[in-house]
From Swiss-Prot:
Residues 54-74 are annotated as: Disordered. This is Integration host factor subunit alpha. Keywords: DNA recombination, DNA-binding, Transcription, Transcription regulation, Translation regulation. InterPro entries: Hist_DNA-bd, Histone-like_DNA-bd_CS, IHF-like_DNA-bd_dom_sf, IHF_alpha. It comes from Pasteurella multocida (strain Pm70). SMART domains: BHL. It holds the Pfam family Bac_DNA_binding. NCBIfam families: himA (TIGR00987), PRK00285.1 (NF001401).
Length: 98
């Protein structure tokens, strides 16, 4: 199962008794704040959850999987998520789905 933004909004409606429009707006604004922070080069630290950070990847040689041809992979910036200790501990307690 995958948790979507719509389901997050539905959970806010149920748990916080928000109306649908406010819940959807809250979810959208939350993620927009994270996007804007990352776009401006800031790391995002969510206490008890984890950190979103920017990492610069250097250029490197790559390979086209279809042809086997060597192709350069250009330098780029990527977003990485590092879970916090509390999140890691809670996830480690869960049983894997079979």
């Amino acid at each position: 199962m995958t948790l979507t933004k719509v389901e997050l909004a539905d959970n806010l409606i149920e748990k916080l008794h928000l109306n649908k429009r406010d819940a959807k707006e809250l979810v959208e604004n939350f993620f927009e704040e994270i996007r804007v922070a990352l776009e401006t080069g800031e790391d995002v630290k969510l206490s008890g959850f984890g950190n979103f950070e920017l990492r610069d990847k250097s250029s490197r040689p790559g390979r086209n999987p279809k042809t086997g041809e060597s192709v350069p992979v250009s330098a780029r910036r990527v977003v990485a998520f590092k879970p916090g200790q509390k999140l890691r501990a809670r996830v480690e307690k869960t049983k894997p789905k079979s």
